[in-house]
């Protein structure tokens, strides 16, 4: 079977409903927390570490929910949403690889913010570089990522960690 290497908004919504990777497996959050409109490229080869990569995008418009509340009179996309999007994509990668279980963000190393997403922006691009995938009792991916707005890098994160668990009862 050939793996799909790009995903539309509808594909991602199917993933948020648990329909893409099957019941009980990795899901993306539903809107409004789904911070990705499309995955333009996913591969288990390539990237900075030659272990896999993802490129995804979010279309920006002034009507997005977070601009109304963060901050009044000074609208900016919360940086934590960009960080969460990177975790979402690492979890998606694990599901795409066929790892069973529900995804959970497990942490990260260094995160740096050196720019912002304003309502005047057009597009956010996420780049994820898989460093390592551990398979066993816990399936875990470790990745580095970056967020760019209209072609300019504004956030980086090292050591993004996401695991998939067949049971989250004792998590």
From Swiss-Prot:
InterPro entries linked to this entry: FabA (IPR010083), FabA_FabZ (IPR013114), HotDog_dom_sf (IPR029069)
Catalytic site positions: 70
Protein name: 3-hydroxydecanoyl-[acyl-carrier-protein] dehydratase
Source domain of life: Bacteria
One Gene Ontology CC term in the entry: cytoplasm
GO MF annotation: an example: trans-2-decenoyl-acyl-carrier-protein isomerase activity
Recorded name of the encoding gene: fabA
GO biological process: unsaturated fatty acid biosynthetic process
Pfam families, per the entry: FabA
Compartment(s) where it occurs, according to its Swiss-Prot or TrEMBL record: Cytoplasm
Pathway(s) where this gene product acts: Lipid metabolism; fatty acid biosynthesis
Disulfide bond positions: none
NCBIfam families linked: fabA (TIGR01749), PRK05174.1 (NF003509)
Keywords for the protein's UniProt record, in alphabetical order: Cytoplasm, Fatty acid biosynthesis, Fatty acid metabolism, Isomerase, Lipid biosynthesis, Lipid metabolism, Lyase
Assembly and binders: Homodimer.
UniProt record similarity statement: Belongs to the thioester dehydratase family. FabA subfamily.
EC number(s) stated in the UniProt entry for this protein: 4.2.1.59, 5.3.3.14
Chain's role: Necessary for the introduction of cis unsaturation into fatty acids. Catalyzes the dehydration of (3R)-3-hydroxydecanoyl-ACP to E-(2)-decenoyl-ACP and then its isomerization to Z-(3)-decenoyl-ACP. Can catalyze the dehydratase reaction for beta-hydroxyacyl-ACPs with saturated chain lengths up to 16:0, being most active on intermediate chain length.
Catalytic activity: a (3R)-hydroxyacyl-[ACP] = a (2E)-enoyl-[ACP] + H2O; (3R)-hydroxydecanoyl-[ACP] = (2E)-decenoyl-[ACP] + H2O; (2E)-decenoyl-[ACP] = (3Z)-decenoyl-[ACP]
HAMAP family: FabA
């Amino acid at each position: 079977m050939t793996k799909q290497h790009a995903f539309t908004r509808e594909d991602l919504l199917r993933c948020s409903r648990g329909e893409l990777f099957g019941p009980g497996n990795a899901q993306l959050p539903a809107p409004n927390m789904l911070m990705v409109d499309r995955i333009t490229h996913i591969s288990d080869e390539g990237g900075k570490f030659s272990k896999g990569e993802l490129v995804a995008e979010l279309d920006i418009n002034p009507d997005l929910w977070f601009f109304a509340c963060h901050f009044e009179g000074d609208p900016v996309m919360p940086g934590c949403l960009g960080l969460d999007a990177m975790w979402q994509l690492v979890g998606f990668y694990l599901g795409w690889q066929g790892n069973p279980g529900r995804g959970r963000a497990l942490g990260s190393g260094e995160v740096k913010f050196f720019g912002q997403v304003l309502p005047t922006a057009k597009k956010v691009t996420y780049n994820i570089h898989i460093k390592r995938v551990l398979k066993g009792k816990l399936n875990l991916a470790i990745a580095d990522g970056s967020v760019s707005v209209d072609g300019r890098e504004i956030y980086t994160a090292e050591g993004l960690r996401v695991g998939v668990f067949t049971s989250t009862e004792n998590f």
